Amino acid sequence: MKLAIAGDSAGEGLAKVLADHLKDRYDVSEVSRTDAGPDAFYANLADRVASGVIDGTYDKAILVCGTGIGVSISANKVPGIRAALTHDTYSAERAALSNNAQIITMGARVIGTELAKAIADAFLARTFDTNGRSAGNVQAIDEVDAKYNAR
């Protein structure tokens, strides 16, 4: 699995910890940008990573900022992306199993490194069942996405 991990200036440290934690099991690209300027803004970082998921550069991604909220909102602006803010393992599991999320986000100022590792592991260990109970909900999400992005 090709996995992107990125953090802004508040999330870069945790992003690097996660990349190191996962690099032996996944094809990890740690793509944080913390230099000054627009490339380091969390919105632009999330856009680059989410666009990479859509174009197939990455299969899944983990984005980190101070709270996880900014990168989540930003990633979800990219058509076709389902990014979920996760600060516990149950939400991470459900993001994969119930929502077919391609991206999870988390806040470096909200959770510690060991919990972040457990969240990443929980998300990446789960696969969406396209014939499961949640398939209709995910299809409906995709239809809403298509409706507004067709304008």
Curated annotation (Swiss-Prot):
Keywords: Carbohydrate metabolism, Isomerase. Its EC number is 5.3.1.34. It is an enzyme of class 5 (isomerase). The active site is at C65. One of its GO terms (biological process) is carbohydrate metabolic process. The keyword Isomerase applies. InterPro entries: RpiB_LacA_LacB, RpiB_LacA_LacB_sf, SPI_LacAB/RpiB. GO terms for molecular function: intramolecular oxidoreductase activity, interconverting aldoses and ketoses. Pathway: Carbohydrate metabolism. Pfam families: LacAB_rpiB. Gene3D superfamilies: Sugar-phosphate isomerase, RpiB/LacA/LacB. It catalyses: D-erythrulose 4-phosphate = D-erythrose 4-phosphate. Belongs to the LacAB/RpiB family. Involved in catabolism of D-apiose. Catalyzes the isomerization of D-erythrulose 4-phosphate to D-erythrose 4-phosphate. This is D-erythrulose-4-phosphate isomerase. It comes from Rhizobium rhizogenes (strain K84 / ATCC BAA-868).
